[in-house]
Amino acid sequence: MKRRDTIVRYTAPERINHWITAFCFILAAVSGLGFLFPSFNWLMQIMGTPQLARILHPFVGVVMFASFIIMFFRYWHHNLINRDDIFWAKNIRKIVVNEEVGDTGRYNFGQKCVFWAAIIFLVLLLVSGVIIWRPYFAPAFSIPVIRFALMLHSFAAVALIVVIMVHIYAALWVKGTITAMVEGWVTSAWAKKHHPRWYREVRKTTEKKAE
């Protein structure tokens, strides 16, 4: 494929940032399910032993949060809701049958919902996780607070897992999306179809640099 037929969607640092977050999520989610459901205790072996999993789980969670915060500051301005997103949401039936609508920028309304849901649930996980983190912080809180934090942590964890499952499904559903995060590039045709406004902005910037 000729270079002019592709567009850089994610740079190497952006992709590394994404996959660090993804790797930490897998470790935290799998070990967390082992904590939450007794029948899934064997999942904790992903970190070695159940005892080691209980020690490492919160540290992995902190790394995941820190990594996602970097992503947040990189992309928050691309995820602000606008009129095109409302139009996109109103035509969700067309989206389901793989028909693109509206003048979508770098991210569509669905991707923006995933982004904001992820940051909300990650904040809840961090706050509740700190409260229940033994032996460092839990002793500073009362039993009722710890119990509430445990429920909140469990809810936020399951909710985030669902959000990420939707994220993965959408990435697999839209052909060419995985390539963007693995290799960093997308075809011009892909960009024109799925993110026309972003495509025009990138082309305009590229043309200015070439002058």
Swiss-Prot record:
Residues binding heme b 2, per UniProt: 57, 153
Name of the protein in question: Formate dehydrogenase, cytochrome b556(fdo) subunit
Record key words, sorted: Cell inner membrane, Cell membrane, Electron transport, Heme, Iron, Membrane, Metal-binding, Transmembrane, Transmembrane helix, Transport
Subcellular location: Cell inner membrane
Transmembrane intervals: 18-32, 54-72, 113-130, 152-170
Positions of disulphide bridges: none
Residues in compartment: Periplasmic: 33-53, 131-151
GO MF annotation terms: electron transfer activity; formate dehydrogenase (NAD+) activity; formate dehydrogenase (quinone) activity; metal ion binding
InterPro entries reported for this sequence: Cyt_b561_bac/Ni-Hgenase, Di-haem_cyt_TM, FDH_cytochrome_b556_subunit, Formate_DH_gsu
